[in-house]
Amino acid sequence: MERQLDAYCEHLRSERQVSPHTLSAYRRDLEKVLGWCQKQNIGSWAALDIQRLRSLIARLHQQGQSSRSLARLLSAVRGLYHYLNREGLCDHDPATGLAPPKGERRLPKTLDTDRALQLLEGAVEDDFLARRDQAILELFYSSGLRLSELTGLNLDQLDLADGMVQVLGKGSKTRLLPVGRKAREALEQWLPLRALTNPADDAVFVSQQGRRLGPRAIQLRVKAAGERELGQNLHPHMLRHSFASHLLESSQDLRAVQELLGHSDIKTTQIYTHLDFQHLATVYDSAHPRAKRIKGDES
């Protein structure tokens, strides 16, 4: 069983080219199943049936595993058995028809509008770190980017003249997002300072040594801003949740918000497939508290 698990993980790495993070998560889940099988004297993957797998899921749920974690584990099992069936090592999938126990969905933490404005409207020092961090905060809240999307952002993805940014989201899917006026202003003040570092690549956000900022560095800068301005813990995804919450509260247009967030769930995607970007931009411009244009501002 261990050899077959190793072979499957190598298949994921070399042929499917899954990310190291995903591979590590799948391996942890499958090793959990393997360990349980060994304790139950199940000597092969072919001997694991739906009743025994259901017992494992129930046991893990009783031990406090979340519904989301169990769904991921079942997904890993299905992937393994798809591989085993293809290789002629098994003729069934014990995860077929199994679903994780339903659990309470935790509501995402958000800032209310007043707290978001408090975070963003404080005085900004005219120096490298302050201008860069302000641009990061504004862009997170303006456009609802994921941390990975902001970290990977390059100069050619920004169009400040038209107030647009193209991001590379999950599954290597691109989407076009509006950039609010306040975020554009913050970026325009940051980019000349960025150029002074003679950056090593086209990253929008770089260190004082000109190197692209990694996820951890950005998390720490956002956390520091939250502690300084709000006296609370703050992380990038809280700004993304706040973006979505405030936009939905103002617009009541769930489909537009889902499109702007880049959610890939087919059940939600099908609802707003036919919405064009102009509609999304109109919803964004009229509803987002940091994007509303001043009268006469056509830029």
Curated annotation (Swiss-Prot):
Keywords: Cell cycle, Cell division, Chromosome partition, Cytoplasm, DNA integration, DNA recombination, DNA-binding. Forms a cyclic heterotetrameric complex composed of two molecules of XerC and two molecules of XerD. GO terms for molecular function: DNA binding; tyrosine-based site-specific recombinase activity. It comes from Pseudomonas fluorescens. GO terms for biological process: cell division; chromosome segregation; DNA transposition. InterPro entries: CB, DNA_brk_join_enz, Integrase-like_cat_sf, Integrase_catalytic, Integrase_recombinase_N, Integrase_SAM-like_N, Recomb_XerC, Tyrosine_recombinase_XerC/XerD. Residues 1-85 form the Core-binding (CB) domain. The gene is xerC. GO terms for cellular component: cytoplasm. Belongs to the 'phage' integrase family. XerC subfamily. Site-specific tyrosine recombinase, which acts by catalyzing the cutting and rejoining of the recombining DNA molecules. The XerC-XerD complex is essential to convert dimers of the bacterial chromosome into monomers to permit their segregation at cell division. It also contributes to the segregational stability of plasmids. It is found in: Cytoplasm. Its main location: cytoplasm. NCBIfam families: PRK00283.1, recomb_XerC. The active site is at 146, 170, 237, 240, 263, 272 (o-(3'-phospho-dna)-tyrosine intermediate). This is Tyrosine recombinase XerC. Residues 106-285 form the Tyr recombinase domain. Gene3D superfamilies: 1.10.150.130, Intergrase catalytic core (1.10.443.10).
